[in-house]
């Protein structure tokens, strides 16, 4: 347990108010962490949770699995009894256009609206500050009562990554895809690719994107005009062009907003 405790950044729990801000011995840290996470032993955190779909940014290591599981546990505790509404995928699908419209709304306004629309469909949205070494952008999990958790961490939460991560996770939920398999890299990759493709095509319709790219004009004014036409946040267009290598990542940074999304 000591080795596991040393993989965990205890400062996070002080900063987020889970424990009083004082000095702790290793032994005390272990006791506190067991309490916070509701586990008999921290060793329970080392196993990959197959009932969860993770969007991670690097390969899984024991350290990242431990820290990802902690984030998941913290999010689950927050979300567990929020609603008895069962996940309704049809309703979620019908709500997609309303969710997409939020990309152009003020960051002060959209989080509540986003939370409400999802809750109405049986999805509890939780935003958590990223725990160091968790390498986690988001995750989804189904609760015993039929509702679902959608966790987003504030890791790299620039506006384009935020919306992409959100719709990636919604893609998993719509596919009823709530499991990851670290043993079977091929399956995991396919399920991630499906969710990525869903997010891409939903945020910018393939035919619209194709037509825009074929014109070959990628000035700031072109990006703003196209974003206006298809009614999406300009950073989503910019992020797509950057990810596909059409523009470099240092261009037009001013089109991206930083969101601090913690619920």
Regions found by a protein language model. Give the residues of each.
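Active-site hotspot residues in diverse enzymes, especially metal/ion-binding acidic/histidine motifs
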Residues: 1-263
